[in-house]
Amino acid sequence: RQKMVAEHESYAEDLSFPVKPQKALIDCRKIMDKDDIVISDVGANKVWIARHYNCYEPNTCLISNGFATMGIAVPGAISAKLVHPDKKVLAITGDAGFLMNVQEFETAYRLGTNFVTLIFNDSSYGLIKWKQDMQYGHHECVDFTNPDFVKLAESFHAIGYRIEKTEDLLPTLKKAFQQDKPVIIDCPIDYEENMKLTAHLEQLMKTL
């Protein structure tokens, strides 16, 4: 456990860009109170959330996990905010999962919910790419282009921010939670970390 904690904390000051998922989740934990709610979409992001987002209270980090329900983060966040209007609600999703239920931002605005959606943007089906790279050593047909997520947010009467450098993420999260509308944060993410994690775990297994 001490080694895991040390590994986790080693990313706290990492300012490389795109943002490493470990660093993104450290910043998310800083902004969220212990009883605030995180909704994880399905994808590579859920692996990183499970490893690097510390939970202190029951039902404060909801991960669909093995059901593979991509697109759950935004509608899940709407529901969480309606049930717990006094708590901060953060949806963390990949770009692919987000686009599967993006239309629900109309619902979010219409119902007056002010939660934050953090998009881990890698312009691909990140978890599928990860699995292909592990199994075959290469990947096919998993990359795609994205819309301008800031303009997309504005088209739904929401607010959009784009992260241009890693040190902007924490203040942007703080600003986002001060808004009275739904917010989308487009955060380029460094999923080169995925295969590094695979290699690390393989080495760890050899020591057991």
Listing of model-derived features with the role each one plays in the protein:
Residues 166-208:
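Glycine/aspartate-rich loop-and-adjacent alpha/beta segment that forms the canonical ThDP
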Residues 105-106, 127-135:
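Active-site-proximal loop->helix
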Residues 47-125:
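Thiamine diphosphate
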Residues 132-172:
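Conserved thiamine diphosphate
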Residues 42-46, 122-124, 189-193:
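Glycine-rich beta-alpha junction loops
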Residues 36-38, 84-89, 115, 181-187:
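Generic beta-sheet signal
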